[in-house]
Amino acid sequence: MATASAIQSSSLAGQTLLRPQQNELVKKVGTAQARITMRRTVRSAPESIWYGPDRPKYLGPFSEGTPSYLTGEFPGDYGWDTAAVSADPETFAKNRELEVIHCRWAMLGALGCVFPELLAKNGLKFGEAVWFKAGAQIFSEGGLDYAGNPNLIHAQSILAIWACQVVLMGLIEGYRVGGGTLGEGLDPLLPGGAFDPLGLADDPEACAELKVKEIKNGRLAMFSMFGFFVQAIVTGKGPIENLYDHLADPVANNAWAYATNFVPGK
């Protein structure tokens, strides 16, 4: 009896001594898991003015009748959905992913349309700096020389470029959607980890603000790309050359002047 009591007392004492350490371990593990969960699933920072019911709306104080399904949970939600395209949660999730991906491509595309032409205007020699004419250089005798330097790797086959693009982009997109050793279990739109080497999204509040900036700049870039396409069709010039022409003679070179004189096919 005494022996059993001693063993029981010893067991209780041991549990008492171990409990603080166990609690501390559980606390640390729980904190780590919470950080991982937050890093992977955080959608917004409640403190940000761009989220929640009091976020800015598309018509400011005159915005009435905001759809109930637009709660301000996601970045770029200004409460505007007159066609109710986001009413279905699955459709909304799909469209949101499509928008973010297109925003990123548009930002890269807008930079690619402007930057080479801007460099060419400042003395850097290109074979062809205008974005919608550059690709046609692959059909020339020497192929497409990068930066106008024939000593660099150059492209001579449109089929080879197409195949490389399909294969490489297909692998990257499949990896993003399906996950892999670097992206498994992470948000496909914001995987973080190895895809965020600078740690820009480590802070949830900063990440929420960056998401808003990304979607706003991406939407602007998509409109810019649309404008570049229209400029190419109407004027046959690149965006920088069109800008220079407009600054030189704003009256003769503007959207209204081209719209009133434009004849398709001429």
Swiss-Prot record:
Binding residues for chlorophyll a 5: K213, Q231
Which residues are modified to N2-acetylarginine?
R39
The residues that the entry says bind chlorophyll b 2 are: R104, I153, L182
The residues that hold chlorophyll b 4 are: Q165, R176
Cite the binding residues for chlorophyll b 3.
S157, E173
- The residues that hold chlorophyll a 3 are Q137, E214
What is the UniProt remark on how the cofactor binds and its stoichiometry?
Answer: Binds at least 14 chlorophylls (8 Chl-a and 6 Chl-b) and carotenoids such as lutein and neoxanthin.
Quaternary organization: The LHC complex consists of chlorophyll a-b binding proteins.
State what this protein does: The light-harvesting complex (LHC) functions as a light receptor, it captures and delivers excitation energy to photosystems with which it is closely associated.
Q: What is this protein called?
A: Chlorophyll a-b binding protein type I, chloroplastic
Organism whose genome encodes this protein: Pinus thunbergii
